[in-house]
Amino acid sequence: MHEAPDPLRLELAAAAARLIADSGLDYANAKKKALRQVLGDGPVPRGSMPDNDEIDAALREHLELFDADHARRVAERRRTAAALMKRLQAFHPYLTGAVWKGIVTEHAPIHLQLFHDNPKDVEIELLNEGVDFEVSTVPHFRSGAEVEAIGFYLGDAPVLLSLYGHDDLRGALRGGPAGAERGNRDALLERLEQAA
């Protein structure tokens, strides 16, 4: 028998989704702020915190209801991602995050995970193309250890490249409970074709 959804959990997911859509917060900070908005300083009942998949569902619903440009933005960012993946094909790019999932806020970057053993090669390629970028770090999708990331804009679209070793690709292709968490250019083109 399937349990009825917890109303508090749904409310927290909706509040976090609004914060992500309207303020560009990341999921962790949106959850914290949603907790304060909904519960104040009160205790958090056990099991009431929504997971990222629940927030994704609430965010998709929010964007479909309140963002008339959402479908256009998804298609536009996916086309931009496909073109960028073609340019960076030597680095084995995979699209992940909001653009892959099709829940693209104004603030959501095109997040490509590159699987290449020398991050400097990626930087040199971007410098040769005249791309103005910033280097930072992001947590590894599996271990949580810091990996190099490169951020820049392509037109008005923010881009985030996270750089992994080639061997990391093996573990990256396992699907999660919500399906594949990333896809190569062929998989992205298939999604674009399905949406057309």
What are these regions (language model features)?
Residues 109, 113-115:
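Mid-length scaffold segments of soluble, non-membrane domains
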Residues 2-24, 31-106, 117-196:
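Catalytic core of pol beta-like nucleotidyltransferases
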